[in-house]
Amino acid sequence: MECIQHESCFDVDDREDAQQIKEQEGTEMVSITQAAKLHNVTRQAIYVAIKQKKLKASKTTRWEIDLKDLEDYKRNRYSRKKSLYQGELLFDNEKGCYSVNQVADMLGIPVQKVYYATRTGTMRGERKGAAWVISQSEIDRYKSEYLNKQTAKKAKGVTVVEHAIAKPEETVSSETLLFENN
């Protein structure tokens, strides 16, 4: 069912919808309703993305979104690289601010270990909203104070274990003990 007067009446497959839109307008611009249909989200979600400046759109008589911008938004929708907190980038790597996942990748340790270190206070991090933000200086301090000690302990533990292993000649079996007592 297709109703040209009311945009909310579109009931077409996603692939056909994108082609129809190109044919109708001659450009690659879509309305909010069409964008919502293409991505299986509500119109409200598209409005919110526009207001948060995560999705580029222009408004002459109605909101129009370029299909390229819509695809770019879809690819980066869950990316935290563009996350904002009070108008500034949350994880600005140029300023030395990193997310927990980025820190875990940099140090080569599991993400849960970074969360544990921030909770216990061994790695200082700052909460901005729901996210932990960790500075470069803190990453360097944690690496030098804790990770280097752990690798030293592991290396020391390996040498202790090597000395603790007995040679086969030095071991005494229970059978020989039984016969020696007689």
Curated annotation (Swiss-Prot):
**InterPro entries for this protein:** HTH_17
Q: Which organism is it from?
A: Chlamydophila psittaci (strain ATCC VR-125 / 6BC) (Chlamydia psittaci)
Q: Which family does it belong to?
A: Belongs to the EUO family.
Q: What is this protein called?
A: Early upstream open reading frame
Top-level taxon of the source organism: Bacteria
List the taxonomic lineage. Answer: Bacteria, Pseudomonadati, Chlamydiota, Chlamydiia, Chlamydiales
